[in-house]
Swiss-Prot record:
Residues 352-361, 452-461 have a biased composition (Pro residues). GO terms for molecular function: ATP binding; protein serine kinase activity; protein serine/threonine kinase activity. Residues 303-480 are annotated as: Disordered. The keyword Transferase applies. This is Serine/threonine-protein kinase PkaA. SMART domains: S_TKc (SM00220). The gene is pkaA. Belongs to the protein kinase superfamily. Ser/Thr protein kinase family.
Amino acid sequence: MRPVGSKYLLEEPLGRGATGTVWRARQRETAGAEAAVAGQPGETVAIKVLKEELASDADIVMRFLRERSVLLRLTHPNIVRVRDLVVEGELLALVMDLIDGPDLHRYLRENGPLTPVAAALLTAQIADALAASHADGVVHRDLKPANVLLKQTGGEMHPMLTDFGIARLADSPGLTRTHEFVGTPAYVAPESAEGRPQTSAVDVYGAGILLYELVTGRPPFGGGSALEVLHQHLSAEPRRPSTVPDPLWTVIERCLRKNPDDRPSAENLARGLRVVAEGIGVHANSAQIGAAENVGALLAPDPAPAQVPGAPDAAYDPNGATSVLPHTSGPAGAADPTAVLPSTGAPDPTAVMPPVPPGQPGAPGQGGPEDPHPWQNQLRAARDRNEQTQVQYLDPNQDPLRRRPQRQVSRPPQQPRQAPQGPPPQQPGYGYPQQQQPQRYATPQPQQPQRYAPPPAPEPQQPRREPRPPRQRSANPMRIPGLGCLKGCLVTVVVLFVAGWLVWELSPLQEWIGTGKGYWDQLTDWFTTVTDWIGDLGGSGGG
């Protein structure tokens, strides 16, 4: 088991997400006074260990420590309580209550959509949790079924909203740049996709998408890519399913308004959903049905929505004209505003350009063809979440690790340029009078298009050697050079056997062995016989 700090031990992983891994852990000793819940030794908790790239960001660590009190005091019956925060070296972890139950995304995948009444009551409890967090100035910004856990108590399931701390930390400047959004593309609000200031209305928009998915089984906006999904959020209207009652569709339509000022507050959303659940039920009376049909009057927007930390009050327009702040009187010793010096009679080189008429290139709000797409950063972030690593074949000739070193061609040294002869320019200083010259700006160089180096030419390949012809056997199978193989040995044995057999059959060797004479006696008798035979031949020839 892996220790986390000095008070917790990780036992087994429960899930893995985009920001870290959730572990089942056990408390070793009672937590200190800085923790929201002291706990008891042996108690089981859930710990979310953030990824190393988050823990190595100094901005996130400072926000982690600075907002410790905000996360620890965020308590509600429908919010997973953060018990403690652990910061140790390269480790950042959130200690939370362990919820024994599936998340809402898994439940919908296994059991299908909910009834309109059940969906309205479940979303009302989530809206209660959002209202409590908005009252504390905390905006979730990533509301989706995967961040809603279902706690089973007494045969009933209670939704528990989690990952508030992760959404809070994601606001760090080290992660969230200008014109980027934090969230999942299928559940992101239009103002988040456009990089506009965000308020608590983004959570109400996410609650509307969640409610739509609870009764239909899928989000209202989809597409084959992140660009299509974002385009649907910005321009398309959700389609009403035939199974959604009129009062419930009124709530969904108000939550999914493109203008955040037209969306209801989380508190009014919870109140309206409970009225709708009573009016569309089987045992609803006429008063409840009438109240549900007039639910639009209850969905009033929030007069003071919670602002996302770090969001500017107004979007920055890079093409807007420069504005001059008015002079305001301040206390003694305050810094004076910038003053314009009076004209001295010399020609003033600074000129005010006439305003560009609308519709012309360079007009405010109209980007040139080379300007980046306003959604470029959002699409890159969404694409990085959804793309997987692709493996493709690499030509060995283009592999820098296998490329042969090339000899660099020596170039002749360049001769230094000689400065033109002439009188040295007079520098303004002590020996020369200073003259006021008009300020001249160099003509801007036209932007050269980016050119890529051509691919290296393929190196000439050496001619391949012709393959060696196969070894051919001799026509005479008995010819074996040196008799150094098994075949030669067998032939030799056969020849010796045949020669011995011929000697045995054609020579008097059998008779000699049968008579028992010695080898020398047999040889002497044979020699005597041959001598007598030759002598007889000679005597008969002489007679």
